[in-house]
UniProtKB/Swiss-Prot annotation:
Gene3D superfamilies: Homeodomain-like (1.10.10.60). Ovary, testis and epididymis. Also detected in the prostate and the mammary gland. Expressed in many tumor cell lines derived from acute lymphocytic leukemia, prostate, endometrial adenocarcinoma, melanoma, bladder carcinoma, colon carcinoma, erythroleukemia and breast carcinoma. Not expressed in placenta. In testis, mainly expressed in germ cells, but also detected in somatic cells such as Sertoli cells, Leydig cells and peritubular cells. Belongs to the paired-like homeobox family. PEPP subfamily. The lineage of its organism: Eukaryota, Metazoa, Chordata, Craniata, Vertebrata. A motif (Nuclear localization signal) lies at residues 155-164. Keywords: DNA-binding, Homeobox, Nucleus, Transcription, Transcription regulation. InterPro entries: HD, Homeobox_CS, Homeodomain-like_sf, HTH_motif, Paired_Homeobox_TFs. This is Rhox homeobox family member 1. Transcription factor maybe involved in reproductive processes. Modulates expression of target genes encoding proteins involved in processes relevant to spermatogenesis.
Amino acid sequence: MARSLVHDTVFYCLSVYQVKISPTPQLGAASSAEGHVGQGAPGLMGNMNPEGGVNHENGMNRDGGMIPEGGGGNQEPRQQPQPPPEEPAQAAMEGPQPENMQPRTRRTKFTLLQVEELESVFRHTQYPDVPTRRELAENLGVTEDKVRVWFKNKRARCRRHQRELMLANELRADPDDCVYIVVD
């Protein structure tokens, strides 16, 4: 008779580790430890811990809850007082953004006069050249890029409108234009 072993991948034996719990977290304790390689505060590299966000250094899980001593598996976690919400990890998230991320630009709301001017040029040509765009941008008081994007979006709206008209004309058939075939 073959015997099968069931392996629970979620179970972690936490009683093996000695957890030192201090009432206040110490900033820079990990980076000041001798033999530490790397820089920055711990936990800023994302969830690289395969043990479900358990941090054995300060006895806290990734949600800010305390790790219970020993046990695991199906045991209910003991309720421990939660740290105040303004922790260094939260302050680090609100800090300066990475250099490669550009701030999101706000949507430009053109005035009625600006839209009228853009529409009049659009009726003349849907693809204005660079000098025309520059002059138009200077007259309107916006950047050339904003003008270029406006023309690009306007062309897309016109194409969509043309497609809608074509579909509407296909659906609306004139009974006089239809051919009826009667089969006996």
